[in-house]
Swiss-Prot record:
Function: RNA chaperone with significant RNA binding, RNA strand exchange and RNA duplexing activities.
Protein name: RNA chaperone ProQ
MF (Gene Ontology): RNA strand annealing activity; RNA strand-exchange activity
Keyword line: Chaperone, Cytoplasm, RNA-binding
HAMAP family cross-referenced by the UniProt entry: ProQ (MF_00749)
Source organism of this protein record: Haemophilus influenzae (strain ATCC 51907 / DSM 11121 / KW20 / Rd)
Region (Disordered): 115-138
Domain of life of the organism encoding this protein: Bacteria
Record family assignment: Belongs to the ProQ family.
GO CC list: cytosol
Gene3D superfamilies from the UniProt entry: ProQ/FinO domain
Basic residues biased stretches: 117-131
Amino acid sequence: MQTEVQKLTNAKAIITYLAEKFPLCFVLEGEAKPLKIGLFQDLAEALQDDERVSKTQLRQALRQYTSNWRYLYGCREGAVRVDLQGNPAGVLDAEHVAHAAQQLAEAKARFAEKRAAAKKAQQKKHPRKPANKNLKKESKLSLSAVDFSQISVGSVVKVKAGDNAKKATVVEVLKDSARVELENGLIMNVAADRLFA
């Protein structure tokens, strides 16, 4: 009885598989280490009996891994290349460091262009409305405090709510507050310091 092996189809799944199989060489999080020159051949030999990955898929996954920003960040002066087992396999030369820096700069520029285009498209979809300059400037509220001892049921007062004052009618006078009914029908308890004439 033979079990069917599930083939890995996308590059991301293949990279995850490589990171599981060769954890000292491939990393999924953090800074990636520069890979040994000719690592593809080593990988092809190590995985030749593995039915999950074809050479073409392996090449595509390796291309994606080495063009990732994390990998390009790791390719800096003095960085040491690693083989499949994580052993040192030579230091990056200046030419490769410069190439990685150029690739990273180009990738960032493409990303910035794409982001700017998406932002522009979003703005076209939902343009910002200009401020209405015809709105009246509201003057500061000039409210005079009401003598709480003079308030009785039926008195018309103003209730301060934030920066606004609403007209209200006193429904009940309590010890240090009053129950009022706003013009919209809402009944609420209001502290004496929030009532004005």
